[in-house]
A protein has these predicted regions:
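Short glycine-rich loop/turn motifs
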Residues: 51-56, 128-130, 262
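Ferredoxin-type iron-sulfur electron-transfer modules in oxidoreductases and energy-metabolism complexes
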Residues: 1-6, 113-242, 247, 267-270
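Short amphipathic, charge-patterned alpha-helical segments
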Residues: 72-87
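Cys/His/Pro-rich metal-binding microdomains
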Residues: 157-160, 203, 251-261, 274
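Hydrophobic alpha-helical positions that pack around
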Residues: 1-71, 83
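Short flexible coil/turn linkers enriched for glycine and charged/polar residues
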Residues: 61-63, 125, 239, 250, ...
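Terminal amphipathic helices with adjacent charged low-complexity linkers/tails
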Residues: 86-121, 217
């Protein structure tokens, strides 16, 4: 369970002794450094971020999988040179780095070198090395909601800002994706995000709002479309979808009505049918 810090584990950790806490990827670099020397390891990478980094590249790219790249590689190189670009000629929209609590970066960030400081400065992080690419068919409000669902499930519940704050943010995102959002919801999301970030005990809560803050920063127009226009530009949020029968193509055969499980389709005359939106199954 997380606890207030300081003291940090490096000062007082296991059994009250100084303790090193690192992930497996960091520890895996130790044998190479001992064998080849620090200078050899530091010859690769950037001034402040040495060596290589393993990314789990996924999402809307042609080549998915684990890739090891030198620090300083650009996001464009990662997506297009290594990942093979976006399938089906779709347009790139965003890349989310760092795992579930990382931020979403946009086209203007593609030529920035990948290192620890650079990603943080742009509202994301290196984290566990996740890299999820999104194209024009992704709804960024739905993306933020997806990651917030995961973060809520993973919260240990010890500190109130994370336990309660993430749930409130998820409730707001759910409300927006269902067409019930208000402009005040955007203000509350930003305020809650900063509160959770500043007052949570561990890194999960401190970074939990990254998906929300970054999408609000770069894709506020999508939030506004959900709230003001009651539409999802990417056509992902099912509660904001409406269906209609193309009267120019309908011949009035009513074959479609026979297969509708809720009788949402009614025949009006010999040449047309009508769709009752109140009966639609979403």
């Amino acid at each position: 369970m997380p606890r207030p810090r300081p003291p940090f584990p490096a000062v007082k950790g296991l059994w009250g002794k100084p303790t090193i806490v690192n992930n497996v990827e960091t520890l895996a670099c130790v044998p190479y450094i001992l064998r080849e020397g620090a200078a050899e390891f530091a010859s690769c990478g950037t001034e402040k971020s040495k060596g290589t980094k393993v990314f789990a590249l996924g999402g809307k790219v042609n080549n998915v999988g684990l890739v090891e790249i030198p620090m300083g590689t650009t996001l464009r190189e990662l997506i297009y040179d290594i990942g093979g670009g976006i399938p089906d000629g779709k347009k790139f929209k965003a890349i989310q780095t760092g795992g579930p609590s990382g931020g979403c970066l946009t086209e203007k960030d593609l030529d920035e070198p990948i290192d620890f400081d650079n990603l943080v400065a742009r509202g994301s992080m290196m984290g566990s090395g996740g890299a999820i690419v999104m194209d024009e068919d992704n709804c960024m409000v739905d993306v933020a909601k997806f990651y917030m669902e995961f973060i809520c499930d993973e919260s240990c519940g010890k500190c109130s800002p994370c336990r309660i704050g993430t749930k409130r943010m998820l409730e707001i995102l759910t409300r927006i994706t269902e067409g019930n959002g208000t402009m005040q919801d955007l203000e509350e999301l930003e305020e809650l995000g900063q509160t959770v970030k500043a007052n949570s005990l561990c890194a999960l809560g401190q970074t939990a709002a990254n998906p929300i803050i970054s999408t609000l920063t770069h894709f506020r127009h999508e939030y506004l479309a959900h709230i003001q226009d009651k539409t999802c530009p990417a056509k992902v949020c099912k509660h904001l979808m409406t269906y209609a029968i193309d009267q120019d193509k309908c011949v009035g055969c009513a074959r479609c009505a026979k297969f509708c499980p809720v009788d949402a389709i009614a025949k009006t005359d010999r040449k047309s049918t009508r769709l009752n939106s109140s009966h639609q199954v979403l």
